[in-house]
């Protein structure tokens, strides 16, 4: 796959109109475009997604099927979220819950978290854990924006080093789009501990 064949989609977990997460994702996607990819911002404000109910078919859950199809079409998915109470935002969790292995298994995923205060480590950790559970391959380079209200001025990054971290995520999203993850691991039947012996 050449860089010009790569499609990068970013899922924005913030519903705020003046979202720092959305601004950062737009910068990330611009960097991916400059690296040769086509890009798409999946703004969850534009999708009707009821709270996930496992008893409801995805086809009967508002725009869930349409969103899942857009995620499936991406070569790399970037998850972006503000940090709320030490984790990532519920709109993003709902969107991911309506997806699954068909959308995320063996997919390349980039992570971006934004916080109004301290470094959003736990939000990144929680997103990474969910991606692992879905057998996705997470780009080693993660992007985080602490103290978000001071990070931007008129929609632009104040700190060039922080902006570089965000644009690097966009470039890596293109660079790693065609990575072949290791085969799923399995417990060997030679492992006596696994057999209860």
Stretches with model-predicted labels:
Residues 2-37:
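N-terminal beta1-alpha1 ligand-phosphate binding loop
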Residues 3, 138-197:
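Glycine-rich phosphate/pyrophosphate-binding loop and the adjoining helix
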Residues 12, 43, 142-144:
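Residue-level recognition of beta-strand->loop/alpha-helix junctions
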Residues 13-15, 44, 113-116:
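Cofactor-binding loop segments of dinucleotide-utilizing enzymes, especially the Rossmann-like FAD-
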Residues 21, 25, 64, 89-92, ...:
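A general structural signal for well-ordered alpha-helical segments in protein cores
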Residues 38-40, 137:
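Conserved beta-strand segments of alpha/beta enzyme cores
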Residues 44-61, 153-155:
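N-terminal beta-loop-helix "entrance" segment that forms/cooperates
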Residues 62-134:
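Helix-loop-strand module that forms the ligand-binding subsite of alpha/beta enzymes
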């Amino acid at each position: 796959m050449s860089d010009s064949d790569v499609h990068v989609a970013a899922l924005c977990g913030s519903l705020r109109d003046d979202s720092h997460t959305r601004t950062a994702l737009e910068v990330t996607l611009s960097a991916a475009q400059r690296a040769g990819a086509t890009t798409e911002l999946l703004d969850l404000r534009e999708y009707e997604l009821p709270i996930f109910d496992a008893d409801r078919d995805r086809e009967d859950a508002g725009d869930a099927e349409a969103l899942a199809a857009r995620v499936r079409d991406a070569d790399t998915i970037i998850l972006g979220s503000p940090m709320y109470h030490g984790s990532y935002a519920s709109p993003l969790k709902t969107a991911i819950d309506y997806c699954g292995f068909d959308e995320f298994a063996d997919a390349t995923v980039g992570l971006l978290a934004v916080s109004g205060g301290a470094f959003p480590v736990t939000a990144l950790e929680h997103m990474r854990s969910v991606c692992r559970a879905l057998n996705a391959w997470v780009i080693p380079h993660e992007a985080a924006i602490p103290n978000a209200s001071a990070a931007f001025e008129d929609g632009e990054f104040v700190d060039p080093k922080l902006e570089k971290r965000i644009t690097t995520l966009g470039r890596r999203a293109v660079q790693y789009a065609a990575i072949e993850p290791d085969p799923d691991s399995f417990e060997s039947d030679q492992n006596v501990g696994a057999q209860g012996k």
